[in-house]
UniProtKB/Swiss-Prot annotation:
One of its GO terms (molecular function) is structural constituent of ribosome. This is Small ribosomal subunit protein bS16. One of its GO terms (biological process) is translation. GO terms for cellular component: cytoplasm; small ribosomal subunit. Belongs to the bacterial ribosomal protein bS16 family.
């Protein structure tokens, strides 16, 4: 099964997360298929805190990837829309 989840980067006390598509069996920060965005929880001022490539997100959801609860929350926070797999297949 393929999942869309966060992969932690950054240094101690300065977290930075990549939003990645990976096989569910692979460890959190291990090998991934594709990086589709990032989340910086400590972004300040003019820094970009969240970026998700919408067309790649739609593609992976369309082929059956499951997003983690945290990624779903970030998608809603970023204003992106999640299209149900059935809607993508019908199009």
């Amino acid at each position: 099964m393929v999942v869309i989840r966060l992969s932690r980067g950054g240094s101690k006390h300065r977290p930075f997360f990549n939003i990645v598509v990976a096989d569910k069996r692979v460890r959190r920060d291990g090998r991934f298929i594709e990086r589709i965005g990032f989340y910086n929880p400590i972004a300040k001022g003019g820094e970009e805190g969240l970026r998700i490539v919408q067309d790649r997100l739609t593609h992976w959801i369309g082929v059956g990837a499951q997003a983690s609860p945290t990624v779903l929350r970030l998608i809603k926070q970023g204003g992106a829309t999640v299209v149900a797999p059935a809607a993508v297949a019908a199009a």
